[in-house]
Amino acid sequence: MLAQMISEELARILSLKEDEVERLLEIPPQETLGDLAFPCFTLAKTKRKAPPFIAAELEAAFLEHKEVTAKATGGYVNFFFHRETVAGQLFQEMKSNQYWQPNSGDGKRVVIDMSSPNIAKPFGIGHLRSTIIGHALYHLLKKTGYDPIRVNHLGDWGTQFGKQIAAYQRWGGDVDLKQNPIASFLELYVRFHEEAEKDESLEDEGREWFKKLEEGDEEADRLWTYFVKESLNEFDRMYNRLGVEFDYVLGESFYNDQMAPVVKELQEKGLLTCSEGALVVPLEDADLPPCLIVKSDGTSIYATRDLATAIYRHHVQKGEKLLYVVGGEQTLHFKQVFHVLKKMGYKWADQCEHITFGLLRLDGKKMSTRRGRVVMLEDVLNDVVAHAKAKIKEKHPNHPHLHEVAEAVGVGAVIFGDLKQDRRLDVNFRLEDALSFEGETGPYVQYTYARIQSILRKGDKLNDSRHMDWQHVTKDEGWSLLKVLIQYPNVLIKATEAREPHQLARYVLTVSKKFNQFYHKYVILADDETVRQARLILAERTGEVIADAMAVLGVKTPEEL
């Protein structure tokens, strides 16, 4: 709010672009030096003036300003906000949509490829990151004026289904498919790979079954349909628990009839070459290995389907930006796909983004399906919720909503524990750390919110904030909290544009920390009504920001813990 106003004013005075000014603005190391500082040293050469002289000129330009005082100190201009005026303006602004939904997207359609688990495999904890990062990005984009749609691009096609069918035909009678189909599918898949190490002909058998599937073989199609149906039932249970929804659930198979036209287009544009019986697009111009389009046995490959998918999302779903929330191990693949789209002449290929993320480890261990070492997300959630329930019950043995709150805290701890990290980094999930009610955790933020709601229940009915005496919330910890609340719209925009939900998670941790410092320094329910009302309004607005930010991240905020 105020930082933007100062940026705009400085940009106008100095004939600079606003983003240039924003990059130069600093937060002083001590509050006695002001709320914002602008260094003038980089301007000395272009303005042909000494930095202290530029600073003095800028101080004079802000003399008549009602909301801020500028003071030149050496080569810096330090800005001091008029605190009570700022507090009043902030609380008024918080009544407007612009605070809660700052529009930077102008209705642009963004298609988000997210979650995308593989059919016939369990919903392992390894699927969590794409699901919740994509979910948070959807809400960030929606908040900031974009028109996002969520697509679950199910892994329901590929040679692995030939292997799955071959395994089912050989050993399907050895597993309990009715009682637990997904676990049985995994058992069959693991057995196939163990047996294939002893008998290489099994790999050929798997390839042959996939070729039959692509050619419309009745038995192959029947089994594939069965695998898809049972898997979707399993996935939906997990999505309901995570609070995640989709606008479209379209597996790779949806694009089967669109791949031949893509191959034809590549041929017509002279982009395909033959390499050892396979068709590839050379990418030496981008310093990338060739992109495989059709394998030597005539079957399609991931890149073919992703090219067809991208074209569909742009032409049919009207995506102006296409986001792919997929792990970092697919970086080369997406570089190849995006560059092939460019070579095909699609200018919008520049609007395709790979939203990469690191591995999720459970106590330092990576997950794998091929060998069966997959950690089920449901097992992790059940374990975390059980521990959360025990912690809550210890403090509140007769909690009226114990199960509901434990679910919110447990699932929220898992989601927040992931999203608070830079998505590009590996995440090592440790249950005890994630569930702590102290430190940088989801439960800490939820506890802060519940504390605020408890205070508000004990307080008075709040008066019209326009007539408040804000001096009671603009000193020390109160001012520190207010300055953080001012930043919320800007944080939403920056987290969205950077595709970094962790910026919002870190922000809500800061809000919680600043509020708790304020809470421990001042009596909110003071005897003096004027003091009490001002502090209650600050508490209420803080709670609103916490709840709103956590909802964007996909974490619930119970009223009581």
UniProtKB/Swiss-Prot annotation:
It is found in: Cytoplasm. Its EC number is 6.1.1.19. One of its GO terms (biological process) is arginyl-tRNA aminoacylation. It comes from the Bacteria. Keywords: Aminoacyl-tRNA synthetase, ATP-binding, Cytoplasm, Ligase, Nucleotide-binding, Protein biosynthesis. A motif ('HIGH' region) lies at residues 117-127. Its main location: cytoplasm. GO terms for cellular component: cytoplasm. CDD domains: Anticodon_Ia_Arg, ArgRS_core. GO terms for molecular function: arginine-tRNA ligase activity; ATP binding. InterPro entries: Arg-tRNA-ligase (IPR001278), Arg-tRNA-synth_N (IPR005148), Arg-tRNA-synth_N_sf (IPR036695), ArgRS_core (IPR035684), DALR_anticod-bd (IPR008909), Rossmann-like_a/b/a_fold (IPR014729), tRNAsynth_Ia_anticodon-bd (IPR009080). PANTHER family: ARGININE--TRNA LIGASE, CYTOPLASMIC, ARGINYL-TRNA SYNTHETASE. Monomer. Belongs to the class-I aminoacyl-tRNA synthetase family. This is Arginine--tRNA ligase 2. It comes from Halalkalibacterium halodurans (strain ATCC BAA-125 / DSM 18197 / FERM 7344 / JCM 9153 / C-125) (Bacillus halodurans).
